[in-house]
């Protein structure tokens, strides 16, 4: 009966369980970070959408203002018309830029969502591994306890048998197999 061998296995299982716990904590930290990045990406996409909407409203307002001026005045100077046209073009360019920012924000949001999902899957995998090694360690602990208890009982029985002069159980079992 090699109790030391079982203790080494228990110690090995314990170290592996600790390693798995460290990896699980690391995966939990990464998941937290990825979820925070995902949340920031959602907020950025919402802000970009809001800014695009504001730019579109400004352009629509400026176009309505120009239309009102055109309908209220029969004649509008060429310089004033060019000025309004230039302003509308700037607003259109801003809308294009805001649209691109929104597209980029949505792409970043999707990437962050994917990264968070992958981090969650990794955490689940690491948690399962840690749980498995915890069970193995618990099983080994029970086995070591049972072996230690059995060894203690055999030793106590041997002492009783030696006290009464009959020889130990270990010696008897060796003699029986010869």
Swiss-Prot record:
InterPro entries: Flag_assembly_chemotaxis_eff (IPR053716). Keywords: Plasmid. Gene3D superfamilies: 1.10.287.1700. This is Uncharacterized protein ORF7.
